[in-house]
Regions:
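A short, well-structured juxtamembrane/interface segment
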Residues: 53-58, 138, 144-145
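Active-site-proximal alpha-helix that buttresses catalytic centers in soluble enzyme cores
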Residues: 16-92
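Catalytic metal-binding/acid-base residues of hydrolase active sites
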Residues: 24, 74, 97, 162-163
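Acidic, low-complexity terminal tails and accessory targeting/binding regions
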Residues: 8-16, 92, 98-112, 151, ...
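Active-site-adjacent alpha-helix immediately C-terminal to a catalytic or transition-state-stabilizing loop
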Residues: 27, 77, 140-170
Length: 170
């Protein structure tokens, strides 16, 4: 689980974003039932992930926050729930804060797409064997989503690694 602070100037504001990666998920039940694609997004946190989320409120960065915004994906939503309960921060759920999109199914294809994404610095080459969301598309999706919160000074955003890394180092 990671935390990182970013000041966004792109929204005509100096909004501070505290990025939080969701806790560790437990995919076992979904894998046993052969779920794929967005079905895997139903995975809850593992015991370790719940513990990570419950301890997160102690991070001093969170003390300056005014709002908690989360991806609608279960592992992020469950992480945000624990933080909201512990801090009393109001919680908003945003479907546009979802995981990076790969337009083909299967874990092997996902890993191949991630490798291509990193090798090509977030660009999608015209001859790419796999179609995926580019870094520019992810940034645009995030900024569009967060524009409605521009009046908040500091916002905690619980989301996913590939989206976070467009704004903070991995």
């Amino acid at each position: 689980m990671a935390c990182g602070l970013v000041v966004l100037g792109q929204l005509d504001t100096k909004m501070k974003i505290i990025f939080v990666r969701h806790g560790e998920p437990d995919y076992r039940e979904l894998e046993e039932r052969s779920y794929t694609g967005f079905g895997m997004d139903l995975a809850p946190l593992s015991e370790k992930g719940r513990q990570q989320a419950q301890e997160l409120w102690q991070n001093p960065l969170l003390q300056s926050a005014n709002l908690l915004v989360t991806s609608a994906v279960t592992r992020a939503l469950e992480t945000a729930f624990y933080v909201s309960c512990a801090t009393g921060l109001p919680l908003r759920v945003e479907p546009l804060l979802h995981e990076w999109q790969v337009y083909e199914s299967g874990i092997d294809r996902f890993e191949e797409a991630r490798t291509l994404f990193l090798e090509n610095k977030g660009e999608l080459l015209s001859n790419s064997p796999i179609q995926y969301e580019t870094a520019t598309e992810m940034k645009s999706r995030f900024l569009e989503c967060m524009a409605k919160y521009r009046d908040y000074q500091t916002v905690v955003v619980v989301t996913h690694r590939m989206l976070m890394r467009q704004f903070v180092p991995d």
